[in-house]
Amino acid sequence: MKTIVATLLCGVALFAAGPLRRAPGFCLMDTSGQWQDLADYRGKIVLVEFMKTECPHCASFSTVLNGLKVKYGDKLAILAIANPPDNPQTMLQFVKGHNLTYPLLLDQGQAAYSYVRTPSLELPTLYLIDANGMIRNSWVDGVLTKDIFEGNGLSREIDKLLAGAPAKK
């Protein structure tokens, strides 16, 4: 019986992981008025975070992302993306209030939908993209992803990509 349950769980895990897919492209304006095109980051590891400025989990996660940017420097690009009802004013307040060291971009929903592929989005949601532009992993903040959103698990995942770990199947 244990073997059957273990086999089923492994099958569910493999199905949930799914195949690698190319990260959908986007070109969005940041809070300083600069256009940020995902294609410009090819060759780097990229974290794409979908967030909201009034989300307390997103606010606390910004500290983790700032720390990762310091730790990895130019080897890691971080792009945070907010959707309405956020606007340039609320976003600028968030950038200044949390001393963001990475760009915060405004999306009208197109980029978010192309990543998540569902009409609703839990926040924060994070995508890890490899240097070839492939989504290697994604996470939604929650009990099961606590290690990722506290930074330790995320650092391990980034280190694997920097070391040239093979893509998950």
Regions of interest found by a model, annotated:
Residues L128-K169:
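Thiol-/selenol-based redox modules, centered on thioredoxin-like
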Residues I45-V46, P124:
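Alpha/beta-hydrolase fold active-site loops
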Residues L47-V48, I78:
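Hydrophobic beta-strand anchors of alpha/beta hydrolase catalytic cores
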Residues F50-G67:
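Conserved redox-active cysteine motifs that mediate thiol-disulfide chemistry
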